[in-house]
Amino acid sequence: MCGRTACTLAPDDVSKACSYQDKQGRQKCPKWRDGDTDKYQPSYNKSPQSNNPVLLSLKHFQKDADSSERVLAAMRWGLIPSWFNELDPSKMQYKTNNCRSDTITEKALYKAPLFKGRRCVVLADGFYEWKRQDGEKQPYYIYFPQIKSEKFPEEQDMMDWNGQRLLTMAGLFDCWEPPSGGEPLYSYTVITVDSSKTMNCIHDRMPAILDGDEAIRKWLDFGEVSTQDALKLIHPIENITYHPVSTVVNNSRNNSTECIAAVILTQKKGPALSASSKKMLEWLQNKSPKKEESRSIIQSPKLSQFGAPPKKTSAGLMQQWLKKEDGEPSPKRAKK
């Protein structure tokens, strides 16, 4: 399952984080589709029906473009099929935020866009999953293992992204045109697979994550890579890490740094943390721990318990984790 994500990077940083090499070996950052940066709002707590950054082939919008060229678009989470004939897309009766890989070639909802080559990569800092234990549900934040950088986001060149590695999930999209006319609605679904060994202790399903640019290239390039070959990329992966977070994330209206901040479970034992997660907990613990009765919320001293929602120019808590010096406050930049 994948029903809640965090995506806190500003639009320009999303583009930098998605840089790739084209067929000529040139490093490129995909551009946003015109007008879509205004549709995307960074958030620590994004739920279905929100607009989120999606990577896809430019050829879907420009027929003369090479299918290997990429573009960023803001799409609605929850696929609305092109054949939907209601005036209001919110009247869609089926939940389409996820699509099971084992039925993707059978259900008409997903079969049509799949065989039309409407493959996309859904971008996020990470996603949330809830573990059921003793009648309760404990949320976990799941993401790619991060490599800390010596550079600050403000110091990076356009083609030299050293910030957080975005989670890249395989998805399908479709385009619905209102029967009464108006702007077409682009929407997507996240493909899910059986959980890997790493994830199985939390949930039995996980998003189909594309690990590495070669997998992303093959999934997006519908002109060169057949549907059959593309589906071979859809499988569980082990290269993920996670940590428990506060139940404040349970309410989708909550949008603060507390949603992704690591907590230490003190009463009930959760799944064993990975090495990367343990390092992150140690880093956060060196900051300013705040104890509660049943768990401890660990946050940076610069972040209040209910920190402000991410701005389109903010780096967020995960970016602080990527700084080189553990336990040291981020140095202030000199005013020009």
UniProtKB/Swiss-Prot annotation:
Cellular component GO terms, alphabetical: replication fork
Keywords, ordered alphabetically: Autocatalytic cleavage, Chromosome, Covalent protein-DNA linkage, DNA damage, DNA-binding, Hydrolase, Lyase, Protease, Ubl conjugation
Active site: C2 (nucleophile), E129
Regulation: Formation and reversal of DNA-protein cross-link depends on DNA context. Catalyzes formation of the thiazolidine linkage in presence of abasic sites in single-stranded DNA. Mediates the reversal of the thiazolidine cross-link in presence of double stranded DNA.
Stored InterPro entries: SRAP, SRAP-like
PANTHER family cross-referenced by the UniProt entry: ABASIC SITE PROCESSING PROTEIN HMCES, DC12-RELATED
Protein name: Abasic site processing protein HMCES
Species, as recorded: Xenopus laevis (African clawed frog)
